[in-house]
Curated annotation (Swiss-Prot):
This is Large ribosomal subunit protein bL36A. It comes from the Bacteria. The keyword Ribosomal protein applies. GO terms for biological process: translation. GO terms for molecular function: structural constituent of ribosome. Belongs to the bacterial ribosomal protein bL36 family.
Length: 38
């Protein structure tokens, strides 16, 4: 999980979701693409 100021989709499988007020990127194809804004 990367913590970044600006989260971006890194591939076409990445999805941006908002959970409990935190913006996250989840990716089914590449788990290394997981990010959250912080």
């Amino acid at each position: 999980m990367k913590v970044r100021a600006s989260v971006k989709k890194l591939c076409r499988n990445c999805k941006i979701v908002k959970r409990e007020g935190v913006i996250r990127v989840i990716c089914s194809a590449e788990p290394k693409h997981k990010q959250r804004q912080g």
